[in-house]
């Protein structure tokens, strides 16, 4: 098992995730240690489309989108784990969430650090511990589960 830590930019992320604007929520992978963990970044800007309605007078990033950002980071870690034969035809389905907690608001100008740690793989389900932080303080945390399928396979 390698201890080399990998990082990559948005161009590499776009080759691995099918998400695109406005739902692509990972801007950069800061560190990826295969078989262990990923640390990724989401720059939160006032130009995000969800801020138009959530909330006009005090923009706050919706908690479900923080969880989605964590799930996308988990998908990138899963990609490093699973190493699919056909990455462009591979989808990561978010299949479960446990113990989600929201600890602080995330606002425009914040840098959301997405920390996801691999816990286990059982019967086709990947399980992760996920924590989103701003300025070193926990904004949200959850246990996430996903599965990997080819795009032409039924979910």
Curated annotation (Swiss-Prot):
GO molecular function: (3R)-hydroxyacyl-[acyl-carrier-protein] dehydratase activity
GO biological process assignments: fatty acid biosynthetic process; lipid A biosynthetic process
Keyword rRNA-binding: no
Active site: 54
This enzyme's EC code(s): 4.2.1.59
Gene3D superfamilies listed in its UniProt record: Hotdog Thioesterase (3.10.129.10)
Keywords: Cytoplasm, Lipid A biosynthesis, Lipid biosynthesis, Lipid metabolism, Lyase
Catalytic activity: a (3R)-hydroxyacyl-[ACP] = a (2E)-enoyl-[ACP] + H2O
Pfam family, one: FabA
Annotated family: Belongs to the thioester dehydratase family. FabZ subfamily.
Protein purpose: Involved in unsaturated fatty acids biosynthesis. Catalyzes the dehydration of short chain beta-hydroxyacyl-ACPs and long chain saturated and unsaturated beta-hydroxyacyl-ACPs.
NCBIfam families, alphabetized: fabZ, PRK00006.1
Record's protein name: 3-hydroxyacyl-[acyl-carrier-protein] dehydratase FabZ
Organism: Burkholderia mallei (strain ATCC 23344)
Taxonomic lineage from the root: Bacteria, Pseudomonadati, Pseudomonadota, Betaproteobacteria, Burkholderiales
């Amino acid at each position: 098992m390698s201890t080399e830590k990998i990082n990559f930019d948005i161009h590499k992320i776009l080759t691995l995730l099918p998400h695109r604007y406005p739902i692509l929520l990972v801007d950069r992978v800061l560190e990826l240690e295969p078989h262990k963990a990923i640390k990724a970044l989401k720059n939160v800007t006032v130009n995000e489309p969800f801020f138009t309605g959530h909330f006009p007078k005090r923009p706050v990033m919706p908690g479900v989108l923080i969880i989605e950002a964590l799930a996308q980071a988990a998908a990138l870690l899963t990609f490093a784990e699973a190493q699919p034969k056909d990455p462009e035809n591979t989808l990561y389905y978010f299949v479960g969430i446990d113990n989600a907690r929201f600890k602080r608001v995330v606002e425009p100008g914040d840098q959301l650090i997405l920390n996801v740690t691999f816990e286990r793989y059982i019967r086709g389900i990947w399980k992760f511990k996920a924590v989103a932080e701003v300025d070193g303080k926990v904004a949200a945390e959850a246990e996430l589960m996903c599965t990997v399928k080819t795009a032409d396979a039924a979910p």
